[in-house]
Amino acid sequence: MEGTHETGQKTDPARGSRDLSGGTRAERRVVTGALFDRVLMVDWSSGNDTGPRPRKDAIWLGESTAQGDAAPLYLRNRVVAEALLGDRISGALAAGERLMLGFDFPFAYPSGFGTALTGSTDPFAVWAWLEARLEDAPKSNTRFALAGEVNRRFPGIGPFWFNGGKVDVPDLPRRDTRTGHGMTERRVVERAAKGSFTCWQMGGAGAVGGQVMTGLPVLHRLRARFPGQIAVWPFEPLDRPVAFVEIWPSLLRGVVAEALAEGGIKDAHQVRLTARALARLAPERLAAILDVSAPEEGWILGLGFEAELQAAAREG
């Protein structure tokens, strides 16, 4: 990964958490007990059902423990994925395991969005707002229409753009003609993560806007299904059996490229190697990587620690 933000350097965990919130809150959290029995990493998709045969640009799940890796699992749509994730959480709770679940989409929008949309800086208020309005099924969803609805609540044009559907959506431009909407283009973490996409782009290769809009409602429902059992990093202290974390598999692009040279599907390699890297790290190193304060915008787990993660992924 090229480029780091000035607040993203490695620190001694004993000295307190890195404040990466853009100065919006002074309090800092020190993560303790950051040791997980099992790590599941999810490559999400906002598209329609991708069929029975494993393929790229679909939902994939990687699973690892300190002892070894499971074969990556192909999930053909979000309904299947949500059901499986619920089963895995139930299984971990029944077994008394600590489970880390990572998702490759942002858990929040740039500072100020939540307040403008919901009247609150609490990221979970946005999760609930989206979940109450998104219609989602294996072969269709209303993400583009919902983005247009959000845009109508803001001045000017935007902040969302790139209607990738066949039907024109009022207030969601197909091209970037945005102006006067008042939102920052990127989160602090995205200004540090060179090559990352913004949350506002709803369509196009590599765009994550649709993933956020279809993914956060699923996370909201899982939190509601398992009350008091799931902590969401970095918004909450990791003192519950299950942790949700935001990932960006491109942090491991080097080791993924090495694996892809031998064949296979890139998405499958990404979740397998990301899960392996986080499962193989020593507890104190994982605690250091989790030692972040970004209470409104969230953060990408492992940004600034790319070399360490790639070394762990190569352990096999």
PLM features: residue spans?
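RNase H-like (RuvC/DEDD) metal-dependent nuclease/polynucleotide-processing core
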Residues: 32-38, 44-316
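Short, Lys/Arg-enriched N-terminal segments with co-localized hydrophobic residues
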Residues: 26-31
